[in-house]
C-alpha cells in the first residue's frame, strides 16, 4: 500500500499574519487559495486554531467557516484537517473545544495554556500531513503575532510559521490604525 505523497517534497507554505483581528487575513487567504488553484497547483488552506461560533459541517465534523470557504476557493473538499482546533466561545472565560471536527470535553475543561501544550503535537502532525498531500498550503494566523503575552503558548502564529518554514505576509487594516 503506497502512502499518499510518498517520495514527494513537502508542500511550500505561505502564511498570512495580521496586525490585528479583522485585518483581512481570511479574505487574503481565500484569494491566495483561488489564485494558486488557477495556476494549476493543488492548494489547501490551514488554520491551526480558530475562535469562532461560525462553523460549517464537513466530513468528520466541523471547521471554521473561513477555512470552509477557502477550501472551496481552492477547488478542494473541505476537511477537518484544514482547521484542526476550533474554539467556540460559550462565555467570557470558557470555550468549547472542537478537535479534528469533534467536541473534546477533556480539553474544554483544561486551562488554556495547558490545552495549548497538549494540542501542539497534533496540530503540527496535521499540517505535516497536508503538506504531503498538496503543492501549496495557505496558512492563516490569528489576531496579531505581536501579542507578547501569548507567545509562550502560541499554536497559531509564529510557531506554525517556523514549523512550516513558511514565507509570511503581514496584513494591516488602515482603518484600524495600520
What are these regions (language model features)?
Residues 2-178:
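Flexible phosphate-sensing "switch/lid" loops adjacent to ATP/NTP-binding sites
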Amino acid at each position: 500500500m503506497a502512502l499518499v505523497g510518498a517520495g514527494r517534497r513537502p508542500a511550500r507554505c505561505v502564511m498570512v499574519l495580521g496586525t490585528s483581528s479583522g485585518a483581512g487575513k481570511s479574505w487574503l487567504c481565500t484569494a491566495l487559495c483561488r489564485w494558486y488553484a488557477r495556476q494549476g497547483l493543488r492548494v489547501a488552506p490551514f488554520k491551526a486554531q480558530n475562535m469562532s461560533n461560525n462553523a460549517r459541517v464537513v466530513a468528520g465534523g466541523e471547521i471554521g467557516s473561513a477555512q470552509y470557504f477557502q477550501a472551496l476557493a481552492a477547488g478542494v473538499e473541505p476537511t477537518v484537517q484544514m482547521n484542526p482546533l476550533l474554539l467556540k466561545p460559550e462565555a467570557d472565560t470558557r470555550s468549547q473545544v472542537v478537535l479534528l471536527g469533534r467536541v473534546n470535553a477533556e480539553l474544554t475543561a483544561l486551562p488554556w495554556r495547558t490545552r495549548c501544550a497538549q494540542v501542539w503535537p497534533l496540530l503540527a502532525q496535521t499540517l505535516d500531513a497536508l503538506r504531503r498531500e498538496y503543492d501549496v498550503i495557505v496558512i492563516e494566523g490569528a489576531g496579531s503575532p505581536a501579542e507578547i503575552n501569548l507567545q509562550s503558548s502560541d499554536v497559531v502564529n509564529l510557531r506554525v510559521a517556523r514549523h512550516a518554514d513558511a514565507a509570511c505576509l503581514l496584513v494591516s487594516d488602515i482603518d484600524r490604525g495600520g
